[in-house]
C-alpha cells in the first residue's frame, strides 16, 4: 500500500525510498514486530480466558511438560496478524507471488486453527482428521503451484533445479504441480512437528525466512541471478518483504514464547509458517535448498516417519520418543539444551544452504 506513495516521488524525491525492496523489507520487519509486541499481551489474555485449560499436554511426554498445563495455544494468530498487516502496508500488492504466499499462509493457518480449536475444546491431542487435513492442504497447495507455474517464464516455470549442478535442469511439466504441492505440505507439517518445545520452532523459522529472503532478493534481480548462475524469476524479489515481516513477527512472538512460554504457537502458526516457507522455495526455484536450510525440520519429520514405520513393521521403536527433540529430552537433555542446540544446528544448515548459491 505504501508503494502508492511513489506516484508522488516526482514532486517529493524522498518518497523514492519506497521503491527499494531492502527499505520496505526493513519497514515490514519493524512493523510486524511492533504489532505483535503491542497487541500480544491482550491476545494472550483473551486466549487464556477463552481456552480455560489451554493446550492439552501429552500423557506419554516428558514429566517436565506437565507444569505447562494451562498455557494457551493458537499463538499463530499473533504471528499471522503481524505478517498480514505488515505486508498490506509494505509489500507491492501488484505481485502475484505475494498474494500466493499470503493465501497459502492464511489457508494453512486456518486448517491449523481448526485443529487447535478441536484439541482445546476436546482436551485431547487428537484434532482434525489426518486424512481430511492433508487433503485440504494438498488442494490449497496444488492451486498455489498452478498459479506459480502460470505466472513464471517457460520453460523454467515447471522446472526443478539443483544447487550443486546449476546447469542441470529437469523439466517436470505438469508433474510440477504435485511436486510443488508436496514441498508446501511437507514443509508445513515438518515445522508443525518441530513445534514441541518453548522457542524451538520459531527461531529456525526466522533463520530460514532470513535465508530465503536473501535468496528471493537475488532470484528476483537479473544482475545478481546471472552472476550467481541461478534462475532469474521476475517478481520474486518482493517476497523478501514478506519474509521480513515473518522475521519481525517471529521476534515479537519469541518474546512471549521464550521459556517459560506464556503462549504456544499451535498448529495455527506452525502450519502457516511452514507452508509459507515451502511456497517461497517453490516460487524461487530453490526447493532442494529448502531441504538443506530447513534440514532441522526434515529430520524432525523423518524421525516421526521412521518411528511410526518401525513400530508398524517390527513392533519396535527406534527412538525413545518422536519427534526427535523428545528423544533427547528422554535421554536427559534439559529443554533449554535441546532448544539452543537445535537453534545452532539450524543456523549451521542455513549457512550451508546459502553457500550453495556460490558453488557451481
From Swiss-Prot:
Highest taxon of the lineage: Bacteria
Full protein name: Phospho-N-acetylmuramoyl-pentapeptide-transferase
Gene this chain is encoded by: mraY
Membrane-topology descriptor: Multi-pass membrane protein
Pathway: Cell wall biogenesis; peptidoglycan biosynthesis
Annotated GO biological process: cell division; cell wall organization; peptidoglycan biosynthetic process; regulation of cell shape
Keyword Metal-binding set for record: yes
Cofactor: Mg(2+)
